[in-house]
Every structure is written in C-alpha cells, then in structure tokens.
Curated annotation (Swiss-Prot):
It is found in: Cytoplasm. It comes from Staphylococcus aureus (strain bovine RF122 / ET3-1). This is D-aminoacyl-tRNA deacylase. Keywords: Cytoplasm, Hydrolase, RNA-binding, tRNA-binding. GO terms for molecular function: D-tyrosyl-tRNA(Tyr) deacylase activity; Gly-tRNA(Ala) deacylase activity; Ser(Gly)-tRNA(Ala) hydrolase activity; tRNA binding. InterPro entries: Daa-tRNA_deacyls_DTD, DTD-like_sf.
Length: 150
C-alpha cells in the first residue's frame, strides 16, 4: 500500500455527484497494490495520525494533524502502482482489483477516523477533479508491505 501525504492549506475533490473540501490538513493519494492488506492500512493510518508535519513557533515540524485541528481529504489513486518499465503507456496490473481495493480503501479511511480524525473522501473508481493547495510544500510518501512500513 502506498499513500502520498501532502500538507495543504485547502483541498477539494469534485465530480458530477461529489463536492468534498477541506481547509488545513492533509490530502492523501491512496494506492492499493496487489499485496495490500488491512494490516498495511492500519500501520499507515497510525503513522499518518501521529506524524508531526506542522510547524511550531520555531519552524520545527512538531505538531500532528490533531494538534492543529486539521482535516483529511482521502482520494483513491490506483495509478500509484503504475508499471512504467516497458513502453510508453503505463500498466496497472500491480494495482489490486477494484472490488478488493475499495474494501481496503474504506477500511483505511475508517482506521484514520478511529484516531478521531475528520476524513472526507473522493469517490472510489471514478474520474475526479482534485484541487490541492500545497503548504510548504510538505509531501511524504508512506509505503507498507506485510503490515510493516517500508
């Protein structure tokens, strides 16, 4: 499982049926790979909930998202598992099939909520417009395999 965390001043995701937005917090781009499990979702959710990615008065990254009353916008993104080794068109066979991936994606979002976080989401498996106003920028990539951070 791969999650790209971007610290944002604001972010939104829209399509024909959806309009979710947050102010200060994280925009998460969530990739579910063939071998991704609920254990991977748990360890990444814990890391994100406790990550100190917001500055204190001395410009040190000392505050986590709860300490700054931030929110999360979680967007599924199977393209994080693109295979670009051959040719010019990426392959996506490393992504988990959608029926299984959606379950892990929803489990991951619920795991974040279990830490008391406000989590808004995109719509799994649809084309969306994602607007991200990066803050910093601060971008961290979390990856887990077999329930362990890589």
């Amino acid at each position: 499982m791969k999650v790209v965390v971007q610290r944002v001043k604001e972010a939104s995701v829209t399509n024909d049926t959806l309009n979710n937005q947050i102010k200060k917090g994280y925009c998460l781009l969530v990739g579910i790979g063939q071998d991704s499990t609920e254990q991977d979702a748990d360890v990444i959710a814990k890391k994100i909930a406790n990550a100190r990615l917001f500055e204190d008065d001395n410009n040190k990254l000392n505050f986590n998202i709860q300490q700054v009353n931030g929110e999360i916008l979680s967007v599924s993104q199977f393209t994080l598992y693109a295979d670009v080794k051959k040719g010019n068109r990426p392959g996506f066979s490393n992504s988990k099939n959608p029926d299984q991936a959606v379950k892990i994606y929803e489990y991951f979002n619920d795991a974040l909520r279990a830490y008391g976080l406000t989590v808004k989401t995109g719509e799994f498996g649809t084309h969306m417009n994602v607007n991200i106003n990066n803050d910093g920028p601060v971008t961290i990539i979390y990856e887990s395999q077999d329930g362990k951070i890589q």
